[in-house]
């Protein structure tokens, strides 16, 4: 069964690129034609690259890998958060802080601080403090939640990242490449394919296109989680290859994530002055 259909891609506007005057010549091989000054992306290639990306993500997760979903533009924020949450993966949909990957030790400390503040708030740790102190702690917690809430359970550098709009997320892409973390991304006609390991030629500006392709990647994660749990679709035989033990929170996700399917229709990480992509 196809991961996604041509009709779904057409209905979501995945084939629409940018104006012909706004393009990257390296994308020429992915362009089918131009119409009324707009490049039309070759969806046959899109389907082929979707299959490659899907298999890579599934295999990565099956072997215990983690996929970080990144999309901070308005068109992608909702779907990135929803789909990553559906399959228990970390995400960044508000802003990318410079050093989030390359300086992960600092990120981890800030995540610990966030959890500490949340625990204080829930267990009465704010009691006995002045209103000014409580206000300061609350603001600190809210700021950390906005910046790092989507990766609160990310204990290590991800095995791969999914990116909506590599131009906007150039800092994230640069950090991933520096660390050798594979990049899976939508490639619009103004993007540089050399920056991406698993490209999916498509429209990264349309909400429906970003949502559809993000859902595809999340579904690949869900299937990878099933394999990791020792399931093999169709024959019910256990997976013989050794994989990392499945955490309890991922076991809880399996029933919901596995049954979901596509519908046919650089700065530091201190609290001050975060870098926004």
Swiss-Prot record:
InterPro entries: Ribosomal_uS2, Ribosomal_uS2_bac/mit/plastid, Ribosomal_uS2_CS, Ribosomal_uS2_flav_dom_sf
Record's keyword terms, sorted: Ribonucleoprotein, Ribosomal protein
GO MF term list: structural constituent of ribosome
Region feature (Disordered): 254-277
GO biological process: translation
GO CC annotation: cytosolic small ribosomal subunit
Family statement: Belongs to the universal ribosomal protein uS2 family.
Protein name: Small ribosomal subunit protein uS2
